[in-house]
Design a protein with these regions (language model features):
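The N-terminal extracellular segments of secreted preproproteins, especially immediately downstream
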Residues: 9, 17-19, 67, 151
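N-terminus-centered regions that define maturation/targeting leaders and the start
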Residues: 33-204
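Bacterial N-terminal signal peptides
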Residues: 16-30
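N-terminal secretory signal peptides that target proteins for export/translocation
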Residues: 1-13
């Protein structure tokens, strides 16, 4: 009679080979780089839009000369990191603490500017409309004026937000939008946003 004892090892010896092959395949899948993930990040350049002022740091007090108690000059502003594809910039300056930061009831708008060239890089202190970069437009603040209106809080210390938007479109020339109208116009066109906040409390 032919013995079958020797056949068992030959059959079971194939199992480890199959398992090793399967594990090798799974291991290869686990460590293989994702082509999709690589293609999404390859060549990507992260650029952060930044807005600064030499007059005050973010969160610090705004100097008196930029307020109604001083010379009412707009502070010097500088920006960098506008993303590729930015056609222009829009700037809104407002105070969400009006009239009393303890019980705010409205946001008071101090300055509205649009179609700023991204390449301009800065605005000088106290810049007049005629000295703005070519093609720049201005809107209406809550005094119904087109020029900068400095902090003039009736009660307490208020926060003043300088908000800069990088846009993928140019807005109509010769337009004098309110803040609300400008915000509506830029919806869906904002590539990046930067913010600078300063505070002010009247000295008397």
């Amino acid at each position: 009679m032919r013995s079958t004892v020797g056949q068992v090892p030959r059959r079971t010896s194939r199992i480890p080979v199959c398992l090793v092959s399967l594990l090798a395949i799974l291991d290869g899948l686990a460590v293989a780089p994702s082509v999709t993930a690589a293609s999404q990040t390859e060549g990507a350049v992260e650029m952060t839009l930044m807005l600064t002022s030499t007059s005050f740091e973010n969160g610090a007090g705004i100097p008196r000369r930029h307020t109604c108690e001083g010379e009412d000059l707009s502070p010097p502003l500088a920006w960098s990191g506008a993303p590729e594809g930015a056609v222009g910039l829009a700037l809104i300056v407002d105070d969400p603490d009006a009239p009393d930061p303890a019980a705010p009831k409205m946001t008071w708008v101090h300055w509205v500017v649009y179609n700023l060239p991204a390449a301009a890089g800065s605005l000088a202190e106290g810049i007049a409309f005629q000295d703005l970069p070519a093609g720049t437009g201005v809107g209406l603040n809550d005094w119904q004026r087109t020029e900068y209106g400095g902090p003039c809080p009736p009660i307490g210390r208020h926060r003043y937000f300088f908000k800069l938007y990088a846009l993928d479109t140019r807005l109509p020339d010769g337009w004098q939008p309110t803040k609300a109208q400008l915000e509506t116009a830029i919806q869906g066109h904002v590539l990046a946003q930067a913010e600078l906040m300063g505070t002010y409390k009247k000295e008397r």
